[in-house]
Every structure is written in structure tokens, then in C-alpha cells.
Amino acid sequence: MTRPAAFGISFDSDRDQTSAAAAPYNSRDHLAVQDQRSRLPVHKHRKELLYLVEGHATTLVVGETGSGKTTQIPQYLHEAGWTGGGRMVACTQPRRVAAMTVAARVAEEVGTELGQQVGYSIRFEEVCTQGVTCIKYCTDGVLLREMMEDPLLSAYSVVMVDEAHERSLATDVLLGLLKKVQRQRPDLRVVISSATLQADKLAAFFDTTTVKGQGAGATGISKSPAIMSVEGRTHPVQQHYAESPVLDYVQAAVTTAVSIHEQDLPGDILIFLTGQEECEAAVTMLDEEARRFRRAQGNSLRLMPVALYAGLPAASQLQVFEMTPRGYRKVVAATNIAETSVTLEGVVYVVDSCFAKQQAYNPLTGLESLLVAPISKASAAQRAGRAGRVRPGFCFRLCTEQDFQALPDSSVPEMQRCELASTVLQLKAMGIDNIMKFEWLAPPPAETMVRALELLHALGALGDDARCQSCLWIPALLKLFLPLLGSWPVARRWSLLWPCSACTACGQEPMGSAKPTMKPNSGLLLEKAT
């Protein structure tokens, strides 16, 4: 078992003898909301940002963690008049909890009720008022579904794609579609922001100045993307590594958190694990430690373990962001949902397992898997940055420094490691018939694309010419079914049977060929083809 001595460090220099039980000091807590806004690093770049957005079709913002880009840029655009004429500013997030929490914060800063001038839209829930909402936070998947009804996004004047470095499937598809939309709508502005953005690659993707007839038009709008860097507000974070490889990273993470708690220093703890089962197991172990500490009564701070993962109900997710009661130390066991966008105030210590679950797809067998894999250095940097928001922090990585240096610099985009049948069908329904010529930020493997077309043809969704069958039905049916596909506990190919069978007037049970079986204690359904 890994004990604190495995890191070979001491917290004595960080100890505050006068207020051990106090919450971590945030120098901006006492300020009014508008004063807090003015002290964010992005505020000094406000005029520069608005100038770039005015003169360039695409603007790339490289903003470090804590710069305020997610909350402030949409407000700057609103204040500059980009929401005039009934249009909105959209800001996409890769996860629903980020869209909800950021929208709530921005509504507070604007001084309006959530759902009025500022709203959000996620799967199965929309808190907006038509004709009133000016700033809309949504997941990238929601905006993709809106494009099926309004391909040119006529309701928006600016679309901001946040956390683009995560390179999710929906984000990559959205970026490709936005590039197409800009050809038809020169007035549409696209702002792409991230903390670890590969700006040069994205700039080259959106640069159309080399395309014949795509230079600066009569309006004077430059087709060459502008790049702006914004410094962060993070405090220094000490990074520590295990002296030897860790056998059980869940147990090691709990042990490390307990050792931090025993030092009786202020500050919450954030543990990064890979999934729901691990988070719940860690919370159970921490609950046992909390009872032990209460019996011993040797610590002035009480442990308050909580979990944070995508499967939690929205209300439970939001509870994690509530202020930690005085006299308690919150320990959050989270998946990579806490890696970007969301801010857990009060976190001083990060315990990083250096693992995450990633989707993998083998086009030869047609099987998808959810694997536990090492994270990239870029993700590790994001996780460490969670510890430096309110004061100097500590990051404990449960791997040796040698193993950390062997990690890849960045993760493989989801586009290149997942099945694409539903994505291809969605693009076909939007009228993009020649998928092979669609401009991808990261082109998917040819074998994966061929497999997707074969599957859709076998299901009857595509004809021999690779065009949509019953083209009048598919867009409407996809709009109805796509919000449900991700929630059905079956493999993606079987969920596609429902809209496809409806389009082809199939009279048999569409799910008859898939007999789901329950895996004990997992809550997941595994496909079993007959």
C-alpha cells in the first residue's frame, strides 16, 4: 500500500498555524461580481478580442486555466452588440455539467434570472426563453442537432467552441460543419478557445485565403484566422511523483488523500479516477476513514467525500460545486469530467491516477470497447491546474516520473477511435452526400468510414449509391431519435436500428436481432448478437 512517505515530501512549510481549520483564502471572494470580472486576466484583452472578432471570420483564443475565457468572452460579445437583431451568442461545452454551471455563473454576473438573457441547453433539458435569451451555453451535441433543422445556424451571430482541445467526436464534426457554414454565411463569427489548444493546426484548418475566391470579400472580413493568447490566473503547483509503480491506484489515491488530511492543513482534495465504480469505491473507503477520524477526534477538519461523474443526475452534480462548510474538507472523487471547464473552488490538492477511460473501435471486427488507458501530458497538465486556482497547490501523480515522461503529448482524437455510423447518418441527413470529401480536422481511418457505410447500407438507411433512403423521413426521425441514442443501454449500431427500421417501414421488431444481457453489478447492457 502506498503511504505518504512514498512521495517523500513534507507540508510543514505550507502550514498556517493560526487558522488550520479555515477555508483556503481567495483574495477575490469579498469583491463585488463586476470587480471580480475586471480582475480576470482576459479583461485586459477585451478590446483586442472584439477587434479581432470584428475583422476575422475565425478567432482562436489560447487561454490558460483561470483566465475567464469561458464566462467573459460571450459577455463581451453581447455587450458589443453581437446579440442585436434577435440573434444569440452560442458557447458550446463538451459536457452538460459545464454548460449548466457556467450558465448559472454568467447569469449571476449579468444580473438576470437563469433562462432569461442567459440560458443553457443540454440533452433533455433547455432553460432558455425564445426572443429573450442572448447568451446560450449548450453541449456541442445539442448544437449539432439544431443544425439538422437550421443548417446555417441563422439564430446565431457568433458560435464559440470552448475546450476544443478535448477533440471529442461532436466537437470535431461541429468544427468541420462551421467551416462549411462560413462559406454560405460570411457574417457568422467562430471563436475557438482552449487552454492547451494546438493553434497552428486549427488556424491552418480554417484558413481559406489560399482557396480561389475565398480571400477577404467586399465586407473586408479576413478569412485568415486570428490567434490571441491570454495568460492564466493560476498559482504555482508543486508536482510530485510516486517513488515506485502503484499496483492499485484507487487504494493509493485514497491513502494519499488520507495522508493529506492527517496533516490538518486547509484545502479541498480532488482525486481523478476513471469511472463511476472507482469513484463510488473511493467515496466508500473515504467514508470509513471519516468515521475513524470522528472517533479519534484528532483532526480539526472533518472529511466530506463526494463523487462526480457523468452518470450522476444533474442535481447531484451541481451539489459538488457548493461551498464546503466551515470545519470540513471536501474530497471529490471524479472522472475527467472535472478536468476542464468546471471549477471546484477551494481545491488545493490534486491526486491524479494518470488514467482515464477511452473508447476504442476495431473496424475489422466491428467491436467497440471502453478501455482504461494512460492519459496524455496535456491532460495531466489540465488536472494539475485544478489545484492552483485559489492558492499555491500540490499535485500528486500516482506514477513514477519516468513513466510520466513516457506519456504521449496529446490524446488521439475520438474521431479516430470510435464507430462513425451514427455520425455518417447524421451528416447524410444534413445533405452532405459525399462524406469522403467532408473536411475533417482529424480524418478518420478509411477502414472505419467504409465499415460505417456498409453498416448503414445493411440496415437499409443507405441505398446502393450511398444516398439516404426515404430522404424525407430521415432528417425528421433523426431529430427525434438522436437525443435518445446515447441514453439507450445498447451498442450504437443497435440503437440505429430504430430510426432506420422506421424509414424503411420495417414490420419486424427492430431490436429482435440484439438480445441484451445484464452484466452483474455493472448496470451496463452488453450486446450479444445471435
Predicted regions and their residues:
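P-loop NTPase motor module signature
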Residues: 1-480, 486-488, 500-511, 515-528
